């Protein structure tokens, strides 16, 4: 899980999700997981 100021999709299968007022990126590839900090 990477914590970044700006999250973005890395590949086609990445999905942007808003949970508890935080943006998350989830993907089948665990390297693409991101959270906005």
From Swiss-Prot:
GO terms for biological process: translation. Its main location: plastid. It comes from the Eukaryota. Pfam families: Ribosomal_L36. Keywords: Chloroplast, Plastid, Ribonucleoprotein, Ribosomal protein. Belongs to the bacterial ribosomal protein bL36 family. GO terms for molecular function: structural constituent of ribosome. SUPFAM superfamilies: Ribosomal protein L36. The gene is rpl36. One of its GO terms (cellular component) is ribonucleoprotein complex. The keyword Chloroplast applies. It is found in: Plastid, Chloroplast. This is Large ribosomal subunit protein bL36c. Coiled coil: none annotated.
């Amino acid at each position: 899980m990477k914590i970044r100021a700006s999250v973005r999709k890395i590949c086609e299968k990445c999905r942007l999700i808003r949970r508890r007022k935080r943006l998350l990126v989830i993907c089948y590839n665990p390297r693409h997981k991101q959270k906005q900090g």
